[in-house]
Amino acid sequence: MSELSVNHLLGIKYLNKQDIQLIFETADHFKEVINRPIKKVPSLRDITIANLFFENSTRTKLSFELAEKRLSADVLNFSSSQSSVKKGETLIDTVNNILSMKVDMVVMRHPNPGAGVFLSKHVKASIINAGDGAHEHPTQALLDSYSIREKLGDVSGKKVVIVGDILHSRVALSNIFALGLQGAQVMVCGPKTLLPKYIDKLGVKVETNLLKALNWCDVANMLRVQNERMDISYFPSTREYTQQFGVNKELLDSLNKEIIIMHPGPINRGVEITSDVADSKQSIILDQVQNGVAIRMAVIYLLASKIKQ
């Protein structure tokens, strides 16, 4: 059987094109499984996985937990708000205490960029990065590309624009890496204040006019404004942001072609996207949610296969 070139999923930048292809092919199989009447397989009955979330999460945490249980893994859920971390315990001490319970794999979300990489150098378990600060969110990028592949047949050659708060988004960076590996053309669009200074060095096009960006693309991935990561004001008002960078039905109908709309969630309806767009036939937002379980099953299964060797 083919295997991943890595022992951890720390970021898309550590993967190659073959890794992504293998994850997608494995996800194809698991997507068929989760659409059966009996949605569970016994693949990981001997594997224990700890979900460590040091930042709040609903969708990603539930998706990982469901993926793990669909694979029959034993699951341990950890919340930093109810732990010794609040008492000053270090990350390594926390994880080593959990690993002493014979945990094989750790899924971790952490506010500090590089936390997963740091942890992988100090513990023996396989690490999956479920988001590290504003750095990377690899499984989100994988499920986004997988959803594009499912809808358009292939990612290569497709034009994808990522719209919104690029500066604070781990989803944007992981998507740029993943789409680039697969041969897509990538553009970022948003207010200048929310575009990283050297973003063009990553090989992406940069646009501040939303209409031009949407007329260029095949797919628009809409990002929310991450107010919780902002300590200053990056634009005059939410109303002005919506006027310049919000997508509504009238704007979509004015384009020179029909495009696909995506969103990693959570959606701020009426800000970056209106309800009639989010719920339209051009939207594949719910497909992304469903595909997230299959992709995470694939990643967990492939990494667990390396543990068992």
Predicted regions, residues:
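Rossmann-like adenosine-cofactor binding region
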Residues: 199-276
